[in-house]
């Protein structure tokens, strides 16, 4: 079992990565688990993993909230349902919230934990590749609003993250590849050596080779942990983790959080951002080609959907990086390096989006 520490002073926690961790969940934790627990999950996940988790939680007072499956249900309505369960059960501020599922479940559960009784303990058990390498680490919690993704939320760190790689065996091919997009992102923005490793091991990752997958997850978590430790509240460095997300979130919102997975939208967003960087002479053409080739090698989208420019603009204007009405873009400037840029003309952005969609 591998361990990655997220260093945040008294709020530090450990990410545990390995096989067969779920059946012995309580024994894996270095601290005593809360007596009152709400497990938030969804039907897709619960049919495989809820029973072994509940067996491990024997002796605790456990309630379960099975939210409906899908990004569109990461909503205030689902949040209210979870709150009703906690209040009706008489749970107090010593309770804990366990997220058993992917990014949607984790984001909602974290927001519930951050606000119930002004904050209760929160535990992450991510079951998708995307959530294991990204959303479960770093403390971002949120629900969506009809006008944009993640507009209502808080920074709230978990007490621990337990990544059981065996959970990936039940992922669909599409959801598995969605997680690969976030892994590619880390190489592009932060670690050229890791990017090269991904190029060299694309075949193994496509085949879900356990050794390659374990390393890719561990290195991704290490990178995110380093970034979060330096910039928890996204005042500078952490913003680079949003590579591809300004365009990606616009794709998701415009297609009503259903037609594209988050990872697919991010992959298309990475291409748009990389092309924008190339066109504005920040990224050389060779590096752009490497980024595109790696996404292609992992069977990820390299073109976004066609939609009116005004739709792109409307959704991008709701991005959290907008300041004083000015769009800010995370652009790769070399493999392993990126920067936040605001000095890009709308005409240039329009032309690049047209070319990439």
From Swiss-Prot:
Its main location: cytoplasm. GO terms for molecular function: 3-dehydroquinate synthase activity; metal ion binding; nucleotide binding. It catalyses: 7-phospho-2-dehydro-3-deoxy-D-arabino-heptonate = 3-dehydroquinate + phosphate. Belongs to the sugar phosphate cyclases superfamily. Dehydroquinate synthase family. Binds 1 divalent metal cation per subunit. Can use either Co(2+) or Zn(2+). Pathway: Metabolic intermediate biosynthesis; chorismate biosynthesis; chorismate from D-erythrose 4-phosphate and phosphoenolpyruvate: step 2/7. It comes from the Bacteria. GO terms for biological process: amino acid biosynthetic process; aromatic amino acid family biosynthetic process; chorismate biosynthetic process. NAD(+) binds at residues 69-74, 103-107, 127-128, 140, 149, 167-170. GO terms for cellular component: cytoplasm. Its EC number is 4.2.3.4. This is 3-dehydroquinate synthase. PANTHER family: 3-DEHYDROQUINATE SYNTHASE, 3-DEHYDROQUINATE SYNTHASE, CHLOROPLASTIC. NCBIfam families: aroB (TIGR01357). It is found in: Cytoplasm. The lineage of its organism: Bacteria, Pseudomonadati, Pseudomonadota, Gammaproteobacteria, Alteromonadales. Gene3D superfamilies: 3.40.50.1970, Dehydroquinate synthase-like - alpha domain. The gene is aroB. Catalyzes the conversion of 3-deoxy-D-arabino-heptulosonate 7-phosphate (DAHP) to dehydroquinate (DHQ). InterPro entries: Dehydroquinate_synthase, DHQ_synth_AroB, DHQ_synth_fam, DHQS/DOIS_N, DHQS_C. The keyword Ion transport does not apply. SUPFAM superfamilies: Dehydroquinate synthase-like. Its cofactor is Co(2+); Zn(2+); NAD(+). It holds the Pfam family DHQ_synthase. Keywords: Amino-acid biosynthesis, Aromatic amino acid biosynthesis, Cobalt, Cytoplasm, Lyase, Metal-binding, NAD, Nucleotide-binding, Zinc.
